[in-house]
Design a protein with these regions (language model features):
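Alpha-carbonic anhydrase
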Residues: 2-4, 9-169
Length: 169
């Protein structure tokens, strides 16, 4: 199975759960974890996420925020080997139950592109997938969230899919 990588320039591609453990939504000093209040049902699903926090209000008006539908014939594909993802070991891994999913705190990974290098902040799972590929949801999606100088690229892998997408945030 061949994986392809696509770079999508999105203004606000990282969702509330994806921000956890980054400079925009740091972990608490005492180790407690706030439980997320979003879900994937009709009344709490993606179309209502903008109302969870006043800071999300712009999401009700935009077209480039999570969740998105990745249309494979409308994207620019990265050249082979132009993106490097590395997690050398799983030492000191921590698991956190956020109420809406499992987050894995593993900070020794990197994502390197032709223009930047990013440090892994965390990764977490969505079931079903948060995003769609050609209008299709998948059973599960994993988001690897990276950070460098306030930029938050997200490497997303959907199960049952050969697509690997990187959202440059």
């Amino acid at each position: 199975m061949k994986a392809t990588a696509a770079i999508l320039s999105l203004i606000a591609s990282v969702t509330a759960s994806c921000l956890h453990g980054t400079s925009l939504l740091p972990r608490s000093a005492d180790g407690t974890v706030d439980i997320n209040s979003f879900n994937y049902t009709n009344t709490g699903g993606p179309l209502t996420w903008y109302g969870l926090n006043g800071k999300n209000s712009a999401c009700s008006k935009g077209k480039h925020q999570s969740p998105i539908d990745i249309v494979t014939h409308d994207i620019d594909y990265a050249t082979a080997n132009s993106i490097r993802f590395n997690v050398p070991s799983a030492d000191n891994t921590k698991f956190e139950n956020l109420g809406s999913g499992l987050e894995v705190v593993l900070t020794n990974g990197t994502l390197v592109t032709s223009t930047s290098s990013y440090k892994l902040a965390q990764f977490h799972f969505h079931t079903p997938s948060e995003h769609r590929i050609n209008e299709e949801y998948y059973p599960m999606e994993v988001h690897f969230v990276f950070e460098n100088s306030g930029k938050l690229p997200l490497l997303s892998l959907s199960t049952g899919s050969i697509q690997t997408c990187i959202y440059a945030g």
